[in-house]
UniProtKB/Swiss-Prot annotation:
InterPro entries hit by this protein: F-box-assoc_dom_typ3 (IPR013187), F-box-assoc_interact_dom (IPR017451), F-box-like_dom_sf (IPR036047), F-box_dom (IPR001810)
UniProt xrefs under Pfam families: F-box (PF00646), FBA_3 (PF08268)
Domain of life, per lineage: Eukaryota
Higher taxonomy: Eukaryota, Viridiplantae, Streptophyta, Embryophyta, Tracheophyta
Start and end residues of each F-box domain: 29-74
SUPFAM superfamilies assigned to the protein according to its UniProt record, in alphabetical order: F-box domain
Protein name: Putative F-box protein At1g55070
Alphabetized NCBIfam families for the sequence: F_box_assoc_1 (TIGR01640)
């Protein structure tokens, strides 16, 4: 006689366990007990996000464990060792995702071998990658006259299309942020609605809470006490639960500034500043600017006064000449600056440039990636210190 009972694990996970007078046996006549739920969870916690994604298809038990609402407590996201880059290439109607380790002490002989994860068919009207945080990437595309935003997981290859925003609204800024306390992703969108033919318009802020497995996603309007113009193509950056992006106040006396959106409280703050490029510098908000002879790094120090510290680095002789190429500034967890182009030609070797600020040395590192077929010019997006995530499952 087989009995069924509910067993509660320490992780507040309820599983159905079968009790029988007979234990399971294999063909050799040996008997074995069923694997306890807590041991299953411990085994799963050792797997990578890519392997765990495959386990969802093994059986309903594994799928239910991985899809639990308290997934972040059962399987906390860990930074890989050594740190890795995630590369997302767009070309030929395909979206390719690769990862590679970050070199510990790069030199001219260093090379990064990218490991392929997924390639996803995307529409030809794909526009650009907007932002990335905590393992997820956000991009947008056009469907007729509507702009549609998509959240994409490069490791699992899954994506979710977000609800279409209000018609007749101009989208000024869009980004995804992460609340590390409540373990939640939120999407912020700033839109404006013009009145008649004049320059007057209403600015609106909307937030969407992105939760695993939730079907009825919707936008909520929130209040912001200050009116400003956003820098539409500025991607911004999320650091420790705060989303930073560039803007300009509508009041001429205030001028350029940085908007600080607290993902958890959904409150706005403002810093008067003209940021050429925002970076995450060792867990602090940074701003970097390249002049003819030097590189200027500004770091926002912690504290109520929000003071900026300034660091000037004279460019070494081996400084690369990008000759008008659109370059993205990145910073590794060790504080090394990394320069990479936003586009590249698959027929030409692709390089990243590491700049050691302390030793004032620039090293060129080749990235070996498979050629993307059918495309002569590829949109490139790189994220340092990447961590795996199982969201969108």
């Amino acid at each position: 006689m087989t009995k069924r009972k509910q067993q509660d694990t320490k992780e507040n996970l309820t599983l159905t366990v079968f009790e029988s007078n007979k234990r399971c046996s294999n063909s050799g006549g040996e008997y074995f007990d069923r694997i306890p739920a807590d041991l299953v969870i411990k085994i799963l916690s050792k797997l990578s996000a890519k392997s765990m994604a495959k386990c969802r298809c093994v059986c309903k038990l594994l799928s239910s464990i991985i899809r639990q609402p308290n997934y972040n407590q059962l399987f906390p996201i860990k930074y890989p060792d050594p740190p890795r880059f995630i590369f997302t290439f767009l070309g030929g109607g395909m979206l390719f995702s690769y990862t590679s380790t970050q070199p510990e002490n790069p030199d001219e002989n260093s090379s990064l071998v990218a490991t392929a994860h997924h390639h996803t068919d995307i529409p030809r009207d794909f526009s650009q990658i907007l932002s990335s945080v905590h393992g997820l990437v956000c991009y947008h595309r056009k469907i007729k006259n509507d702009t549609v935003f998509v959240i994409y997981n490069p490791i699992t290859g899954q994506y979710v299309t977000l609800p279409i925003l209000e018609a007749h609204a101009t989208i000024n800024y869009f980004a995804i942020g992460y609340d590390p306390i409540n373990k939640r992703f939120k999407v912020l969108c700033v839109t404006s609605v013009h009145h008649g033919t004049g320059e007057e318009f209403d600015s609106q802020h909307q937030v969407l809470t992105f939760e695993t497995g939730r079907r009825n996603l919707f936008w909520r309007k929130i209040q912001c006490r200050r009116h400003y113009y956003t820098h539409r193509y500025h991607k911004g950056i999320c650091i420790k639960g705060v989303l930073y992006y560039a803007a300009t106040s509508m009041k001429p006396m205030l001028g350029p500034m940085i908007v600080c959106f607290d993902v958890r409280s959904e409150k706005f703050g403002f810093i008067t500043w003209k940021p050429p490029s925002l970076i995450n510098y060792k867990g602090k908000l940074g701003s970097i600017n390249s002049n003819d002879n030097d590189l200027v790094l500004w770091v926002l120090e912690h504290g109520q006064e929000r003071k900026w510290s300034k660091h000037i680095y004279v460019k070494p002789l081996q400084w690369p000449e990008f000759n008008g190429i659109d370059v993205n500034f990145l910073v590794t967890s060790k504080g090394e600056a990394v320069f990479c182009p936003n586009h590249y030609d698959p027929q030409v070797p692709f390089y990243l440039y590491y700049y050691n600020l302390e030793e004032n040395i620039v090293v060129r590192v080749r990235v070996e990636v498979p050629e993307s077929q059918g495309s002569k010019r590829v949109l490139f997006h790189a994220v340092p210190n990447y961590l795996e995530n199982m969201k969108l499952t």
